[in-house]
Swiss-Prot record:
Function: Catalyzes the formation of N(4)-acetylcytidine (ac(4)C) at the wobble position of elongator tRNA(Met), using acetate and ATP as substrates. First activates an acetate ion to form acetyladenylate (Ac-AMP) and then transfers the acetyl group to tRNA to form ac(4)C34.
GO cellular component entries: cytoplasm
Keyword flag ATP-binding: yes
Protein name (Swiss-Prot/TrEMBL): tRNA(Met) cytidine acetate ligase
Reaction catalyzed: cytidine(34) in elongator tRNA(Met) + acetate + ATP = N(4)-acetylcytidine(34) in elongator tRNA(Met) + AMP + diphosphate
Alphabetically ordered keywords of this record: ATP-binding, Cytoplasm, Ligase, Nucleotide-binding, RNA-binding, tRNA processing, tRNA-binding
Keyword Ligase applies: yes
Gene: tmcAL
Superkingdom of this protein's organism: Bacteria
Record EC number: 6.3.4.-
Organism of provenance: Clostridium botulinum (strain Okra / Type B1)
Length: 409
C-alpha cells in the first residue's frame, strides 16, 4: 500500500489546501493519504477557529483518508519542534512512503541542500555562524548570512538563499527535511509550489485566499455566502450549517480576559516556558496591565527580537497551563502514540497496516491513564472549551473518531 502524508493546520481549510491534497495524490500516486493536523491551537499562536473534530471531518470530506492529531505541545512550538513532532509520529507508523509539503520555491533539491547543511553544520559554517553571532546579530539573520557566504561560489544559490529563508513555507519545509534526516527516515519528501495569497494577507482574493483573510472576514461579517468561492464546497456547506446552529468561531480576542485574570490572580510563572527568554516575562506582565485586546497586547510585547507568532504561542501556552510542565524533557522525546480524529474506509485499512508494522499506541478513545503529552492535549481542549460553546469540558473523553463511509475520493 503506497501511503502519503501531509502536515496541516486547516485554520480553516480553503481552496489552497484542497489544491495541496489533489497535487499530493497526483505527485506521489498514493493509494491513501494520511493527514497529521494541529488540534484546537495552531502554530502561529491562535486558538483554531473550528474545533479539531470539525476540522478533521472537513478534511475527510475533501479527500484525506485518515486524520491524526498533532499533539498540542508541538502545534504550539517553533517550526523546528512543530516539524519534528509531526515527522517523528509519521516515521514511527512504519507505513508512510512519502510526505508532501507546500513551499514558495517548489524545489526539493535546494531545500534538501540547505537542510543538510543546517543539520550537519560543517566546520566552515560553524565558524561563519559564530563570527556573525559575536557581532550581536540575531540567530536567524546570522544563520542566513553564514549560509550565503558558505555558498558564495554558487552565485545563484548565494543570491537567493536569503529570500528562500525569509519565506515561511520554505522554512517549515527545511525543518521537515531536517527531521527526516535526523530520524534517518525512509519517507521520501516531495514539495509543491504554494499557490495563492501569503498567509499574512488579510484580503480575499480570487480562488486562493489565505486562511488569515477568511478568519478576518468571519470575524467581521455574517454573510457566509461571500466565502463560497474561497472554500471547498463541502467546507462551505459545513460553515453554513455551523452558522445556522449558532456555532462559536474561536478567535484570539476571546482569550484575553482569561489570560489577564490568570495574571492578576498571581500566576506569574511565565519564565518556565521555553520561548520565554530572560526579561520577556516581565515585558508580558507589564503589557497585561494595560492591554485590553489581544492585538494590542501582542503589539505591546512584540519587537524585532520577539516575533508576533512567538508571542502568540507563549500566550496560548500560558492560557492552557504549559508552564506547569517540564517542556524541555517532553520535546527531547518522541511521541509514542497516535490519536485518530477521523477516517474513511480507506483510512481504516491504513490503521490495519499500522497495527501490523508498528508498535505505536493507537488511540481512538482515551485511556484512563494518560501520559504527560496526552494530558496536555486534554488541558488544551478544556481551555478551548472556554472559547467555544460547542465544546464541553473533558470533551476528549466523550468523542470518538468520525468514520465517514462512501466518500467520493
Amino acid at each position: 500500500m503506497n501511503v502519503s502524508a501531509i502536515v496541516v493546520e486547516y485554520n480553516p481549510m480553503h481552496n489552497g489546501h484542497l489544491y495541496h491534497i489533489e497535487k499530493t495524490k497526483k505527485l506521489t500516486n498514493c493509494d491513501a493519504l494520511v493527514c497529521i493536523m494541529s488540534g484546537n491551537f495552531v502554530q502561529r499562536g491562535f486558538p483554531s477557529i473550528l474545533d479539531k473534530w470539525t476540522k478533521a471531518n472537513m478534511a475527510i470530506s475533501n479527500g484525506v483518508d485518515l486524520v491524526i492529531e498533532l499533539p498540542t505541545l508541538y502545534s504550539l512550538s517553533s517550526a523546528e519542534f512543530f516539524s519534528f513532532g509531526a515527522v517523528s509520529i509519521l516515521d514511527s507508523l512504519n507505513i508512510i512512503n512519502s510526505i508532501c509539503f507546500g513551499s514558495e520555491i517548489g524545489n526539493i533539491n535546494v531545500l534538501q541542500d540547505i537542510a543538510t547543511t543546517l543539520l550537519e553544520e560543517p566546520l566552515e559554517y560553524k565558524i561563519l555562524l559564530k563570527n556573525y553571532l559575536d557581532k550581536g546579530i540575531s540567530f536567524a539573520k546570522a544563520r542566513n548570512l553564514a549560509l550565503v557566504e558558505l555558498n558564495r561560489d554558487n552565485k545563484i544559490m548565494s543570491e537567493n538563499i536569503s529570500k528562500i529563508l525569509s519565506l515561511s513555507n520554505n522554512i517549515l519545509g527545511i525543518e521537515y527535511l531536517k527531521s527526516l534526516l535526523l530520524l534517518n527516515s525512509s519517507i521520501k519528501p516531495f514539495t509543491i509550489t504554494r499557490e495563492g495569497a501569503d498567509y499574512k494577507d488579510e484580503n480575499l482574493h480570487e480562488e486562493y485566499s489565505s486562511a488569515s483573510s477568511i478568519r478576518k472576514y468571519l470575524k467581521e461579517n455574517k454573510n457566509i455566502n461571500i466565502l463560497k468561492d474561497f472554500l471547498p464546497l463541502e467546507g462551505f456547506l459545513e460553515f453554513k450549517r455551523l452558522i445556522t446552529k449558532g456555532y462559536n468561531f474561536s478567535m484570539e480576542d476571546s482569550m484575553i480576559n482569561y489570560i489577564r485574570y490568570k495574571y492578576i490572580s498571581g500566576y506569574k510563572n511565565l519564565h518556565n516556558l521555553i520561548d520565554v527568554s530572560e526579561g520577556l516575562d516581565n515585558r508580558i506582565y507589564k503589557s497585561l496591565e494595560k492591554s485590553f485586546t489581544y492585538d494590542s497586547l501582542v503589539g505591546e510585547i512584540k519587537s524585532k527580537r520577539y516575533a508576533y507568532s512567538r508571542i502568540g504561542r507563549i500566550l496560548c501556552q500560558y492560557f492552557i497551563g504549559f508552564e506547569n510542565y517540564d517542556l524541555n524533557s517532553l520535546l527531547k522525546s518522541t511521541p509514542n502514540y497516535m490519536r485518530v480524529l477521523a477516517s474513511n474506509e480507506r483510512g481504516l485499512k491504513v490503521l490495519k497496516e499500522v497495527k501490523k508494522h508498528s508498535s505505536i499506541n493507537i488511540y481512538t478513545k482515551l485511556p484512563k491513564n494518560t501520559n504527560t503529552l496526552l494530558s496536555l492535549d486534554i488541558k488544551a481542549t478544556n481551555a478551548y472549551s472556554l472559547l467555544n460553546n460547542n465544546i464541553r469540558f473533558n470533551e476528549d473523553y466523550f468523542r470518538s473518531p468520525t468514520i465517514i463511509k462512501n466518500t467520493i475520493y
